[in-house]
Amino acid sequence: MKIRYWLLAMSFIFLSCGRVADDVEANYGIIPMPNELAPMQGVYVLQGKKTVAVPSGEAAMKVFHYLEDALKNTSVTLKGISETGKADICLSIDNSLPNEAYTLEVSSDRINISSNETAAGFFYGVQSLLQLMPAAIYDGDRKYEGKIRIPAVSITDAPRFP
């Protein structure tokens, strides 16, 4: 009889452990969890030389340099341009978004981060983008030479608390 209870308890423990792993995969590992996250089909591969459309203004330029610095330990080279149509990564201004809000769209051929003209929204969008990348790019001891595979996703987020 004791063996039956012991087996039942152990089964419960093993089955409950599997759900935690599923939940971690479902949220894409972004902390804090965005208000809206819609997984999409495909993967964006970040490697080699990429262009980044940077709107005029100090806020977007600071965030561009932050992204450039975050990827310095990889083989990716970023070049800032002003033409949005030809860019691999596009920072764009959307004044319909509230302060500090952003949208992040990752498709198989492009990354787009939109925010109003404040640096905070662009910064939060870049933070979410960086969290979608493999942790190995942050290893300061050696350069990450592999392809950076970013899952396709659509995110809309804004601060929950004023």
Task: Write out the residue ranges for each language-model feature.
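Positively charged n-region of N-terminal signal peptides that target proteins for export
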Residues: 1-5
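Acidic, contiguous N-terminal accessory segments
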Residues: 17-161
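Bacterial N-terminal signal peptides
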Residues: 7-14
